[in-house]
């Protein structure tokens, strides 16, 4: 038995809400995956702020129809589709999917759409991999913090070196005067 019009409306609103929070959507072909495998994929994606939605292409088509940023996704809506809606860590989500794909060997990435404001860009698997290879937000923050810390450390050493140099110079002059006096 099919879903009622009301339940489809609820699903459609959930999809629209999820899409509005996502910055990237990856579309995968999930044919052949078991419920346990899909649950495993969801578990791997959860720490990256990504949700996996399995829904009919027609419902996803209706959900993206009102948002021009997701329009490029229309070309990916065919066959059995699962949608990986990435809210936070794009690189981490792609790596988690790649790890799952390597384990299951049953899924295929059709592509993705990166939403930038009101525009969306269709991405191939190679382009998604290039994005995933970029450092994560946490790694960039750590690199910047490390650079700032290094500058502060060098500055502190330089400031401490001035009095130490002065003390060594005074000591050298005092020793010189002692030698001359003796």
Swiss-Prot record:
How does the annotation summarize its subunit structure? Part of the ribosomal stalk of the 50S ribosomal subunit. The N-terminus interacts with L11 and the large rRNA to form the base of the stalk. The C-terminus forms an elongated spine to which L12 dimers bind in a sequential fashion forming a multimeric L10(L12)X complex.
Q: What does this protein do?
A: Forms part of the ribosomal stalk, playing a central role in the interaction of the ribosome with GTP-bound translation factors.
Which gene is the coding source of this polypeptide chain?
A: rplJ
The alphabetical list of record keywords is: Ribonucleoprotein, Ribosomal protein, RNA-binding, rRNA-binding
Q: Which HAMAP family match?
A: Ribosomal_uL10
GO molecular function terms attached to this record: large ribosomal subunit rRNA binding; structural constituent of ribosome
Q: Which family does it belong to?
A: Belongs to the universal ribosomal protein uL10 family.
Question: Where on the tree of life does the source sit, at the highest rank?
Answer: Bacteria
Q: Which BP terms does GO give this entry?
A: translation
Name the CDD domains for this protein: Ribosomal_L10 (cd05797)
Identify the GO cellular component terms for this protein: large ribosomal subunit
What organism is recorded for this protein?
Answer: Microcystis aeruginosa (strain NIES-843 / IAM M-2473)
Quote any Pfam family the record assigns.
Answer: Ribosomal_L10
For this entry, the protein name equals Large ribosomal subunit protein uL10
């Amino acid at each position: 038995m099919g879903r009622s019009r009301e339940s489809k409306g609820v699903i459609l609103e959930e999809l629209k809400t999820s899409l509005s929070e996502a910055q990237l959507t990856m579309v995968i072909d999930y044919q052949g995956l078991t419920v346990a495998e899909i649950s495993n994929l969801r578990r791997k994606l959860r720490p990256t702020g990504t949700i996996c939605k399995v829904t009919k292409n027609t419902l996803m088509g209706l959900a993206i129809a009102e948002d021009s940023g997701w329009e490029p996704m229309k070309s990916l809506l065919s066959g059995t589709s699962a949608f990986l809606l990435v809210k936070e860590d794009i690189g981490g989500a792609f790596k988690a999917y790649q790890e799952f794909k390597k384990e299951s060997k049953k899924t295929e990435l059709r592509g993705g759409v990166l939403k930038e404001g009101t525009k969306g860009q269709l991405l191939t698997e190679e382009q998604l991999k290039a994005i995933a290879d970029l450092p994560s937000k946490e790694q960039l923050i750590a690199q910047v913090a490390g650079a700032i810390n290094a500058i502060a450390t060098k500055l502190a050493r330089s400031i401490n070196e001035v009095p130490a140099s002065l003390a060594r110079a005074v000591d050298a002059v005092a020793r010189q005067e002692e030698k001359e006096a003796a």
